[in-house]
Amino acid sequence: MPAASKNVVMIDNYDSFTWNLYEYLCQEGANVEVFRNDQITIPEIEQLKPDVVVISPGPGHPRTDSGISRDVISHFKGKIPVFGVCMGQQCIFEEFGGDVEYAGEIVHGKTSTVKHDNKGMFKNVPQDVAVTRYHSLAGTLKSLPDCLEITARTDNGIIMGVRHKKYTIEGVQFHPESILTEEGHLMIQNILNVSGGYWEENANGAAQRKESILEKIYAQRRKDYEFEMNRPGRRFADLELYLSMGLAPPLINFYDRLEQNISAGKVAILSEIKRASPSKGVIDGDANAAKQALNYAKAGVATISVLTEPTWFKGNIQDLEVARKAIDSVANRPCILRKEFIFNKYQILEARLAGADTVLLIVKMLS
């Protein structure tokens, strides 16, 4: 069932973050109903016919302050997906026999990086993702139930995520709905993409769903940049240093450049340089970006869009760099736009240093 048609019941453990979580779920297309943990019964939830149940964050201890939350987990296991956030995860931990105790530190609105298993909520989420924490309690490793597996941890070993090995039940200790959490929207999308009561059942359903080309490119570019961002001399800090040293070429305003053509009674043409596409295959595998850019500039175009994605479009960031150099001496040169599947600040910084005046952002890829 598509995320847009998922009916979600959220149990509110009297926490203000419940409504941030509500907003994220709604933004991803879910229909969400929220009920306080002492103001609804299991039969009433059954009557609502939810596709997913979410257990919210909350103050206190899951054993004493979570109301109906643990009963909800017990009742709906093996029937529909159940996801928990912060106290919601602690409820999962305790319901299956684990202990939630003092975590050894108190954190309130602080970020930590976590490593994860790239499954469930963490599918396609980069490693060392920064997440926001508000807690002093956590599930203990020594009491981890045999039926649960750890999905994420901080650098100092605190459990940040658990998943049931059989049932579609998963939780995280941090807050994906916090603005400081990286890839929070992707995590929420992943929640809503789960169906059925068992992971095995869900895996079969997921296998039947055809992955979109955008999803394929997105996943591949994440892998590409995990490598690229760790190359010596190409790390984020390196690019920031280059920018501070004034190594980025001067830029022109994209909108002003379009307006120049329009004000002069000309068509503001946005031209494009690409060697291939997913739909057309190879268009011109030998296309020279510098030569093509100069031809476009001489023809009076307002903007030159340069595809820099290597796998499906056969481009690269060097294409943009040489295209910019080729037109720098042209009077009233066109604007250079990087057309790419952009999902992080590194790619924007990289584009700027290569000579881009602006970049294309695909809203569906942003979180």
UniProtKB/Swiss-Prot annotation:
Amino-acid biosynthesis as UniProt keyword: yes
EC supergroup of this enzyme: lyase
GO molecular function: anthranilate synthase activity; indole-3-glycerol-phosphate synthase activity
EC number: 4.1.3.27, 4.1.1.48
Glutamine amidotransferase type-1 domain residues: 7-201
Pathways per UniProt: Amino-acid biosynthesis; L-tryptophan biosynthesis; L-tryptophan from chorismate: step 1/5; Amino-acid biosynthesis; L-tryptophan biosynthesis; L-tryptophan from chorismate: step 4/5
Active site: 86 (nucleophile), 175 (for gatase activity), 177 (for gatase activity)
Gene Ontology biological-process annotations: L-tryptophan biosynthetic process
GO cellular component: cytosol
Keyword terms, alphabetized: Amino-acid biosynthesis, Aromatic amino acid biosynthesis, Glutamine amidotransferase, Lyase, Multifunctional enzyme, Tryptophan biosynthesis
Region (Indole-3-glycerol phosphate synthase): 209-367
Domain of life from the UniProt record: Eukaryota
Pfam families (UniProt xref): GATase, IGPS
Reactions catalysed: chorismate + L-glutamine = anthranilate + pyruvate + L-glutamate + H(+); 1-(2-carboxyphenylamino)-1-deoxy-D-ribulose 5-phosphate + H(+) = (1S,2R)-1-C-(indol-3-yl)glycerol 3-phosphate + CO2 + H2O
Binding of L-glutamine, residues: 58-60, 90, 136-137
Misc. remarks from the entry: Component I catalyzes the formation of anthranilate using ammonia rather than glutamine, whereas component II provides glutamine amidotransferase activity.
Subunit and interaction comment: Tetramer of two components I and two components II.
Name this protein carries in UniProt: Multifunctional tryptophan biosynthesis protein
Organism, as annotated: Pichia angusta (Yeast)
